[in-house]
């Protein structure tokens, strides 16, 4: 079964989300950055790699937050969420996200 990870970044009671570029199943939707785990990769290694690829930042992976199993006609996977701390203060958009934005808990 496929495993995916997301990192939840919290700063000043706001959460960092990325707007997916158009196309695919999740195009033009806001999401916590992350992605699929590669073979032999731990959740922490996958998050570090995904944040480097998607946002060009170095991170520290904190505590485990939640796990959710998803199953539908297109997907069957487990999603694991972790607290993430960005070690540098600057994140940038990539080909995966067209925009990054901070949201309050009420906006989520």
PLM segments and residue spans:
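Nudix hydrolase/Nudix homology domain
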Residues: 25-29, 91-108
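Active-site-adjacent beta-strand/loop module that shapes the phosphate/pyrophosphate-binding cleft
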Residues: 3, 58, 68-91, 101, ...
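Conserved N-terminal beta-strand and adjoining loop/helix that marks the start
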Residues: 1-16, 36
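Conserved Nudix-box catalytic region and its N-terminal flanking loop in Nudix hydrolases
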Residues: 14-53
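Short secondary-structure junctions
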Residues: 54-61
